[in-house]
């Protein structure tokens, strides 16, 4: 089994990324090997935590492999629109959600179209995308339009106005900073079966301490090699945007995982990454303050001092 490279000096020893590498090593060497939904198999531990200080623009962007932060940012901005269709992502060359609607299309139609050809049809045919590009009421739908129902008479109910949890959190951070209810929840039990994938990063909570905004994200299921680098970035970016919108300084990001795992077919990536040492510290500049948290654009974000080591890839388990 691989062992994590050891920090060469006291400065390296304090680098936040050693937490990530140690978690990866622990899963790969000591995790429980188990069957999973995808059929690929995982090594898994239950219950993990990482902490990261967002002060001075610092961001949890891995240096031991290249993380495509613009892709992760575009996904977060897409969540905030409430969209559940992959077409806006496809048109930005964001590929991370393509496999799920493609698998559904092949399963339901029997047409064994190649993934690239399916994605090209999503991009070029709006009607096709409307029918086959939707993921069900995932993430953003729950975040900004959580469904409500109201009595319509005769024991029937009709759809009521949706709840914008993100807007509510912005308001509560400004009006009642000491509240323990600054929460964005994605786990809508009534709609899980209609989602392409139930939310993995399911719960976000925010906490004001002095003039700093802390963020916590709980992830019920975490692919540490491919998913977690994106999830850390997304949670940190959301915390940074909320801090700017509500007038606080960025505080600490706390990540908590439930079933935290590595897929058995990710061995080459794991071995390669565990042989590397973290270095440097990427920082995020937000170049303007939009009117609302829903008005950020990818051009508003600038990363400086990011010098990652080479990209590492592995197959996505669907």
For the regions a protein language model found, what residue spans apply to each?
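Terminal, non-catalytic protein-protein interaction segments that mediate quaternary/complex assembly
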Residues: 2-318
């Amino acid at each position: 089994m691989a062992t994590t490279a050891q920090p060469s000096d006291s400065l390296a020893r304090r680098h936040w990324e050693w937490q990530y590498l140690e978690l990866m090593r622990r899963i790969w060497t000591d995790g429980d090997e188990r069957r999973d939904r995808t059929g690929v198999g995982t090594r898994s531990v239950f219950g993990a935590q990482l902490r990261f200080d967002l002060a001075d623009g610092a961001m949890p962007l891995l240096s031991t492999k290249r993380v495509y932060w613009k892709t992760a940012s575009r996904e977060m901005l897409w969540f905030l629109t409430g969209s559940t269709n992959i077409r806006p992502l496809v048109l930005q060359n964001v590929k991370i959600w393509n496999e799920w609607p493609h698998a559904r299309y092949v399963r339901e139609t029997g047409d064994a179209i190649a993934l690239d050809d399916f994605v090209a049809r999503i991009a070029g045919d709006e009607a096709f995308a409307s029918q086959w590009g939707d993921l069900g009421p995932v993430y953003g739908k729950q975040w900004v339009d959580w469904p409500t129902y109201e009595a319509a008479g005769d024991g029937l109910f009709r759809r009521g106005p949706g709840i914008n949890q993100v807007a509510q959190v912005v308001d509560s951070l400004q009006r009642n900073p000491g509240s323990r209810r600054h929460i964005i929840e994605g786990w809508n039990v009534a709609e899980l079966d209609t989602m392409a994938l139930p939310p993995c990063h399911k719960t976000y909570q925010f906490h004001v301490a002095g003039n700093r905004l802390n963020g916590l994200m709980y992830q019920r299921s975490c692919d540490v090699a491919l998913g977690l680098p994106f999830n850390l970035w997304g949670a940190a970016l959301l915390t940074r945007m909320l801090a700017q919108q509500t007038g606080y300084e960025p505080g600490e990001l706390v990540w908590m995982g439930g079933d935290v795992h590595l897929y058995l077919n990710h061995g080459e990536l794991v071995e390669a990454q565990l042989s590397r040492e973290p270095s440097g510290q990427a920082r995020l500049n937000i170049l303007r303050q939009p009117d609302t948290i829903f008005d950020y654009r990818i051009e508003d974000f600038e990363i400086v001092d990011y010098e990652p080591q080479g990209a590492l890839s592995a197959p996505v388990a669907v």
